[in-house]
Amino acid sequence: MMAALYPSTDLSGVSSSSLPSSPSSSSPNEVMALKDVREVKEENTLNEKLFLLACDKGDYYMVKKILEENSSGDLNINCVDVLGRNAVTITIENESLDILQLLLDYGCQSADALLVAIDSEVVGAVDILLNHRPKRSSRPTIVKLMERIQNPEYSTTMDVAPVILAAHRNNYEILTMLLKQDVSLPKPHAVGCECTLCSAKNKKDSLRHSRFRLDIYRCLASPALIMLTEEDPILRAFELSADLKELSLVEVEFRNDYEELARQCKMFAKDLLAQARNSRELEVILNHTSSDEPLDKRGLLEERMNLSRLKLAIKYNQKEFVSQSNCQQFLNTVWFGQMSGYRRKPTCKKIMTVLTVGIFWPVLSLCYLIAPKSQFGRIIHTPFMKFIIHGASYFTFLLLLNLYSLVYNEDKKNTMGPALERIDYLLILWIIGMIWSDIKRLWYEGLEDFLEESRNQLSFVMNSLYLATFALKVVAHNKFHDFADRKDWDAFHPTLVAEGLFAFANVLSYLRLFFMYTTSSILGPLQISMGQMLQDFGKFLGMFLLVLFSFTIGLTQLYDKGYTSKEQKDCVGIFCEQQSNDTFHSFIGTCFALFWYIFSLAHVAIFVTRFSYGEELQSFVGAVIVGTYNVVVVIVLTKLLVAMLHKSFQLIANHEDKEWKFARAKLWLSYFDDKCTLPPPFNIIPSPKTICYMISSLSKWICSHTSKGKVKRQNSLKEWRNLKQKRDENYQKVMCCLVHRYLTSMRQKMQSTDQATVENLNELRQDLSKFRNEIRDLLGFRTSKYAMFYPRN
């Protein structure tokens, strides 16, 4: 029987001496008895073994013959092999679809057959199984399928529902078949949900509950499922990536899994955008507004470019989507507008253009103020020209700050309340203009979006300091009219406080130029790296301050006890020769000494320990504390900071192009709208365009209360709805094209991989096996059903 089951094995040349001896012929210390401790199932009969072997070899005629001869029912058609696979499972794994149909017709059952077919991605088997299942009166839900599949009597090996498994495999064809069965998916609850269902599941099995949530999100993040079930796949990918990123911060045990799913959603949105073939499709995608977003009715009627989808991508931090080549090309076109020829000019002409606009920016601003709708005004309205004009205005403001320090009057140095100079009034005009610009951005963007930008935060702090400076100067001028030496002034005199705030505001004003580096492909990545390093330094600061505070408390408590006079403080503990050493007798002094010691700015003699007879123990403890501080901070924490900064820089350098393009897009978007066209201080002057808008809005409001006005308003709303519906239809048409191209590109990638080659080999093997069995059956080579066990020589 052994030779029959394993015909390729030759045991004739194996001597009995080479085989291991039985345990009975050897001592117990020389052999180890092996015993199967697992559940032993009933041994299959010879017919059952033949039945399973025929299914494995894909012999359709032999399987059919065995099933036809099983009229008495002696053969268990649901028998399993040593691996726990029944005939249906074996047939699915071998992709023998004709045998699968035959087995199902004869009533072979398998609880996890559909799961095996989905896991093996055998589309034909899934189609056969779904069509063979009896129709039910009620719609099956995923919860019911889960309960049925996870029933212990089925002994299934997969703890997942069919549609979830198909989504995990990202198989578009199988998902299409399953969704036609009217299945549903349970909506995942939040991590901290305290509803009755979540509390019961979490109490019963918290691991299963967390794993089920992860499986659901794996299903929802499947690109194939998103394309099939969502009308707006890009928006759904944005929302899912944000939810998954939030989940990765809450469920830290599965952080890597959730981060990988979030990355998958981002890459899907990027790849879908990459399928756009012309500017018209890009314009439809990037300007699409979802139903939940606020609409600009005037911009919609005037067919203005709002780029709402691109703004949403920046809000959701979709760096891959924004930095995609098609998106960047479209942004470049919008950025230069009517000055598209600027990019093709030589470098010298580019510099001359920028310098000319930078010098004559007041004249250009006045021209736009007078005639904003003219051809010249439209050129100024392009984002690139707005950027140059706003930059020139800010450089003029910095020049005024430098002039302010140069024209400082020494005669008024001791004046307690000096009057404002002419240059002060010019600075106030600029500051009011910058504040008005920030107020308009705050109004249109909202507080949350406004504060997300570090550039807006810096501008807010800077303008607040300037306002406080000039307010204190006005207070000092109205309250103080005397002259006195500065050393006699109060420490918090309004003039002194104003000068301090003004100095700090000047520092921030120049640091604000860093954000202009974002437009440069050379300086931009460096500016982004510096921002990331500052964030990492903030994390390091929390650890460093704790260590500094700990050692400061210890040294202060050690050296400030029992000493009240300077004579007693001389030469005590850690010693400083020839000068009074009271460094560690106060909290502030100890903190300063330990801080500056990191930069080698503290005198070395401070940390020399003097051992005397009376203070030997105290001096030794102080030396140990300072030595430990030296090791922990100077050696360990400082090197840790260097490693953190190097890691941050390397992380930005590895994704330099993506990070820079994303930061540049954020800067460019702030110049795309028509809310802040004029720079400070011209933006505080009411323009004719603003006056016309106000008059038009007022007249519309007045006319809306008349009968003709109401009819006109209804017609306008109807026109707006029709235009919105037309835009939505165009978006759906473009999205269908993108999905079709995406599926085609994915299919081409699959055909070029090794996996596709293996599938082709499997198909070829099945065809050859089928052909062999048909030839044998026709020629009558198989005279007995046991010929598979006893092949002819």
Curated annotation (Swiss-Prot):
Regions crossing the membrane: 387-404, 423-439, 456-475, 497-517, 537-558, 624-644
GO BP term, example: phospholipase C-activating G protein-coupled receptor signaling pathway
Activity regulation information from UniProt: May be operated by a phosphatidylinositol second messenger system activated by receptor tyrosine kinases or G-protein coupled receptors. Also activated by intracellular calcium store depletion.
The entry's keywords: ANK repeat, Calcium, Calcium channel, Calcium transport, Cell membrane, Disulfide bond, Ion channel, Ion transport, Membrane, Metal-binding, Phosphoprotein, Repeat, Transmembrane, Transmembrane helix, Transport, Zinc
Chain positions covered by the region annotation Disordered: 1-30
Membrane topology: Multi-pass membrane protein
Biased composition (Low complexity): 15-28
Reaction(s) this enzyme catalyzes, per UniProt: Ca(2+)(in) = Ca(2+)(out); Na(+)(in) = Na(+)(out); Li(+)(in) = Li(+)(out); Cs(+)(in) = Cs(+)(out)
Pfam families tied to this protein: Ion_trans, TRP_2
SMART domains: ANK (SM00248), TRP_2 (SM01420)
Primary location: membrane
Topological domain spans for side Cytoplasmic: 1-345, 380-386, 440-455, 518-536, 645-793
InterPro entries, A to Z: Ankyrin_rpt (IPR002110), Ankyrin_rpt-contain_sf (IPR036770), Ion_trans_dom (IPR005821), TRP_dom (IPR013555), TRPC1_channel (IPR005457), TRPC_channel (IPR002153)
Record note on modification: Activation of PRKCA induces phosphorylation of TRPC1 and subsequent Ca2+ entry into cells.
Positions in the Extracellular compartment: 405-422, 476-496, 559-623
ANK repeat feature ranges: 46-75, 83-109, 111-156, 158-180
GO molecular function: store-operated calcium channel activity
Oligomer status and interactors: Heterotetramer with TRPC4 and/or TRPC5. Forms a heteromeric ion channel with TRPC4, with a 1:3 TRPC1:TRPC4 stoichiometry. Unlike other TRP channel proteins, does not form a homomeric channel. Interacts with TRPC4AP. Interacts with ITPR3. Interacts with MX1 and RNF24. Interacts with FKBP4. Interacts with PLSCR1. Interacts with PKD2L2. Forms a heterotetramer with PKD2 with a 2:2 stoichiometry; has distinct channel properties separate from PKD2 or TRPC1 homomers alone.
PANTHER family, A to Z: SHORT TRANSIENT RECEPTOR POTENTIAL CHANNEL 1, TRANSIENT RECEPTOR POTENTIAL CHANNEL
Family statement: Belongs to the transient receptor (TC 1.A.4) family. STrpC subfamily. TRPC1 sub-subfamily.
Name the UniProt record assigns to this protein: Short transient receptor potential channel 1
Gene designation: Trpc1
